[in-house]
Amino acid sequence: MTFTKIYHTPDGFDDMMMSSDGKLLTGLWFINSQDHSKHIMGLEEKDLPVFCGTKEWLDIYFSGRCPDFTPEYRIDGLTPFRKEVSDIMQSIQFGQTMTYGEIAALIAQKRCIRKMSAQAVGGAVGWNPICIIIPCHRVLGANRSLTGYGGGIKNKIALLKLEGIEFRKT
């Protein structure tokens, strides 16, 4: 069974949906985004301890501060490549960014190969089921340009501004 809870965000952001298996967070996405539409069938709304912890984390984050803890989560379907990309995204600090190309270069270096596809990295970034906590919004295109965002470009812009991140609108 999958349980859900709505998180009401501050003005300027779409509200969010949290999902859980009953113990761990299994999803966090903006409502009305392309990510949300994948997850809306067969869910039961319920108050759970993991939702309280996630709400606390989000409250701190949306106040413009970096939370000093991470809610416990589980990611289903995490391939080794997606895990590599997810681990790198989690290393991007509040207020910082990386490009798809920079992530690809790190993976290539780690694997001792000449080159890794930035487009493949983009696919793994876009797959992320736990937005903000795994900060896919901090990944930018070449020259710090905005690219698509599963949570909606409006939300990506607002998240980057909240963190004081400069970017180029394309």
List each language-model region with its residue ranges.
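Basic nucleic-acid-binding alpha-helical/helix-turn surface characteristic of O6-alkylguanine DNA
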Residues: 1-112, 116, 166-170
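Short Lys/Arg-enriched helix C-cap and helix-to-coil transition segments
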Residues: 132-139
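Short, flexible micro-motifs
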Residues: 30, 67, 98, 125-129, ...
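Regulatory, non-catalytic segments
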Residues: 114-130
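…primarily DNA-binding HTH/wHTH and HhH modules…
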Residues: 142-170
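Flexible, gly/pro- and Lys/Arg-enriched active-site loops
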Residues: 113-119, 146-151
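A broad detector of the eukaryotic-type serine/threonine protein kinase catalytic domain
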Residues: 90, 108, 126, 141-144
